[in-house]
């Protein structure tokens, strides 16, 4: 019996050590398999961590779970299952639940990990000194009387020796009528660890905004704004965080919210990306037009109006009127946040018309042919902003003097021409907002608007600048922060995107003073509330947490049916999840 346990501990440790060493060398691999039915994967710092909702930590750990069952090919009959059934299977998280181990098996694996690191186990065939491995966490199926969902083990070590181990136990349950007292938690902690002094630290997360779907056919953008608050000491369970707390805004914004004030500007950006992809791949997937009239009709009408104005020598005045009309059409949905530009030049107006109506390469050729012919005849003398290096701008400047280069509207030239004027227009839109709102200067924006890089890189940088705009506007709409906070947020986003690629899943974190955001949380229920009791040793702690969503992803919890709800309550009000983290210390010497 003991020889079998010793051999199992040796094999388990060897597998963990190999996984750990290969990870340090940068070798990426699949989880290693132990005894055919168990897999172990190393979660590095910064990677998605299944324990983040429990321990609020993000360190390197081993996760132990069952090997997932291979999904069999569905039979024709199974493929005909109803949509409701498919959705039900997905929502229950059944696949994740199958990964959990029985509590007896979990304790056995924790035992192997402990044995291998115990310096007194000199009979084990393990190289000495033993390498201290990251903490080990095992998914449990919650079938025991205590409902254990995780077991964990973390080493206690000095600079050169492993002196002991901390064993963790996590339980979780649906608890409509939870009853817990802070003093009882403290007494339990003192009794378990035989310590006289302790501290209680609090954490609360408030959901300030979360986007929702318009209907079943339009998915919501994944935009969330939450507020994390930490403080110490804690006076009572579910205490409202005091104004002396430490607070951080967490902001994740996905561009393109269909109901958002930037939806039109985002559509222009998407059209710009279509053109850029077309240049890069040779294939252009034209979007559906917004206009009833064709692009050629719209451009011809636009040129006719300018031509008539030119005959009366009053093109500047009429241009301004047309600009204001177009600006209202293009930017009307964001005029509460973006200063409506009344200075769109000829090229920018042309972009507005063509980006909403062009549906083919032939449209591009015909539209630019009409423009060039009007310039060659002198029928129009449009004005332009200074600073543009686009091909169309050069032709317009040449037309002022009656001599124009010959341009062959073939190959990629028409796409490049429209892409250039779109880039110029969007850059000016963003500059107008950030400078108008006093959130950035031209120097701050130089990286994003510089024409010194190739066209594809310019498009990529403009896309990043648009995401910054979406982040700032979302905060302006939903949390209405002071200008100082908006300025700090803008600068933080600018700094991040000067050094990183576009990532709409990135969570921007901004420290804030609780006094500046107190109206957002003091009368609200937290999405998550946690108290952590410890005795001066970080690893020796007791944690109690209340949340409105399951903190454990591999267990299925009974949820009330919608029929259980009354007019006076909501689903969120009826469901609470509580979980406890307790630990015990084992000293090897």
From Swiss-Prot:
It holds the Pfam family Zwilch. Its main location: nucleus. Gene3D superfamilies: 1.10.287.1880, 1.20.58.730, 2.20.25.230, 6.10.140.520, 6.20.270.10. The keyword Glycosyltransferase does not apply. Keywords: Cell cycle, Cell division, Centromere, Chromosome, Kinetochore, Mitosis, Phosphoprotein. GO terms for cellular component: RZZ complex. The modification Phosphoserine is found at residue 88. InterPro entries: Zwilch. The keyword Cell cycle applies. It is found in: Chromosome, Centromere, Kinetochore. GO terms for biological process: cell division; mitotic spindle assembly checkpoint signaling; protein localization to kinetochore. PANTHER family: PROTEIN ZWILCH HOMOLOG. Belongs to the ZWILCH family. Essential component of the mitotic checkpoint, which prevents cells from prematurely exiting mitosis. Required for the assembly of the dynein-dynactin and MAD1-MAD2 complexes onto kinetochores. Its function related to the spindle assembly machinery is proposed to depend on its association in the mitotic RZZ complex. Component of the RZZ complex composed of KNTC1/ROD, ZW10 and ZWILCH; in the complex interacts directly with KNTC1/ROD. This is Protein zwilch homolog. It comes from Bos taurus.
């Amino acid at each position: 019996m003991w020889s079998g346990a010793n051999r199992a501990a040796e094999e388990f440790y060897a597998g963990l050590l190999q996984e750990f060493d290969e990870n340090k060398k940068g070798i990426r691999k699949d989880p290693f398999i132990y005894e055919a039915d168990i897999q172990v994967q190393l979660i590095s710092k910064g990677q998605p961590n299944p324990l983040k909702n429990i321990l609020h930590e993000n360190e390197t750990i081993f996760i132990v779970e069952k090997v997932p069952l291979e999904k069999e090919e569905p039979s024709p009959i199974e493929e005909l299952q109803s949509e409701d059934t498919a959705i039900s299977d997905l929502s229950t998280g059944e696949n994740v639940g199958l990964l959990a181990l029985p509590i007896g098996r979990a304790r056995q694996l924790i035992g192997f990990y402990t044995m291998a690191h115990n310096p007194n186990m000199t009979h084990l065939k393990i190289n000495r000194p033993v390498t201290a491995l990251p903490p080990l966490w095992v998914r449990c199926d919650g079938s025991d009387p205590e409902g254990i969902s995780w077991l964990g083990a973390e080493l206690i070590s000095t600079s050169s020796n492993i002196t002991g181990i901390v064993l963790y136990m996590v339980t979780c349950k649906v608890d409509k009528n939870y009853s817990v007292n802070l003093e009882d938690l403290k007494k339990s902690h003192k009794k378990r660890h035989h310590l006289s002094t302790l501290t209680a630290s609090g954490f609360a997360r408030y959901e300030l905004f979360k986007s929702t779907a318009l209907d079943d056919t339009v998915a919501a953008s994944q935009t969330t704004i939450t507020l994390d608050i930490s403080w110490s000491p804690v006076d009572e369970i579910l205490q409202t965080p005091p104004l002396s707390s430490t607070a951080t805004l967490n902001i994740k914004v996905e561009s393109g919210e269909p109901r958002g004030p930037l939806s039109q500007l985002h559509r222009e950006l998407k059209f710009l990306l279509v053109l850029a992809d077309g240049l890069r791949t040779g294939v252009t997937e034209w979007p559906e037009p917004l206009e009833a009239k064709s692009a050629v009709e719209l451009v011809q009408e636009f040129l006719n109006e300018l031509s008539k104005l030119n005959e009366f020598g009053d093109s500047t005045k009429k241009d301004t009127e047309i600009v204001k009309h177009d600006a209202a059409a293009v930017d009307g949905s964001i005029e509460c946040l973006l200063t409506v530009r009344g200075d769109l030049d000829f090229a920018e107006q042309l972009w507005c018309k063509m980006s909403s109506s062009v549906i083919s390469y032939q449209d591009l050729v015909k539209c630019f042919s009409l423009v060039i012919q009007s310039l060659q005849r002198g029928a129009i003398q449009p004005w332009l902003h200074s600073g543009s290096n686009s091909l169309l701008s050069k032709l317009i400047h040449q037309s002022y003097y009656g001599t124009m280069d010959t341009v062959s509207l073939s190959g990629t030239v028409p796409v490049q021409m429209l892409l250039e004027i779109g880039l110029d227009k969007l850059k000016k839109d963003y500059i107008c907002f950030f400078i108008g709102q006093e959130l950035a200067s031209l120097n701050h924006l130089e990286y994003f608007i510089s024409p010194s890089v190739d066209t594809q890189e310019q498009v990529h940088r403009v896309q990043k600048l648009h995401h910054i705009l979406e982040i700032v506007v979302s905060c302006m709409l939903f949390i209405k922060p002071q200008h100082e906070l908006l300025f700090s947020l803008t600068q933080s986003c600018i700094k991040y995107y000067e050094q990183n690629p576009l990532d709409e899943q990135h969570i921007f974190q901004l420290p804030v003073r609780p006094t500046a955001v107190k109206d957002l949380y003091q009368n609200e229920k937290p999405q998550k509330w946690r108290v952590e009791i410890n005795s001066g040793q970080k690893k020796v702690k007791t944690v109690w947490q209340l949340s409105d969503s399951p903190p454990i992803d591999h267990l299925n919890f009974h949820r009330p049916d919608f029929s259980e709800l009354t007019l006076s309550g909501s689903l969120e009000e009826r469901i609470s999840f509580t979980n406890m983290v307790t630990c015990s210390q084992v000293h090897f010497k």
